[in-house]
Amino acid sequence: MLETMRQQDSIHRKAGSVHGCALFCGGDMLMFVEDVGRHNAIDSIAGWMAMHGVSGADKSFYTTGRLTSEMVMKAAQMGVPIIVSRNGVTAMGHELAARLGMTLFGRAANRHFLCYTGAERFDSEPDPQRAAVRVVKA
């Protein structure tokens, strides 16, 4: 996912001042949207999912914006259990994701990221050749 996002051609890379969101199924990016507002970007993906009857159960969601409670709630409404952001996670976003049983990753850059909730979904003995995960305890 992170490698796909790093290679993604984007307005942000060319001009800045926009947020990007993507929907993934495994390692495959299904949709990528950029907008000046992170809420607009996630709403575009939610609308696409609704229009095409796409279930979020086996999907993951990536955003360049902060993971606030609003972003976590929108992902939950989409049925997406795993959320990844290259930025940070707010306390309310973290608490809501934990209550909803979602997996929340923040500060995802290169091959390193923080797992705030839902670490039990992943191998506790990561392959040293793969991404490094640090679990954050509440």
Mark where each language-model region is:
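Conserved mixed alpha/beta catalytic, RNA-binding, or beta-rich assembly cores of soluble enzyme
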Residues: M1-R66, M71-M73
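Conserved catalytic-core subdomain
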Residues: V72-A138
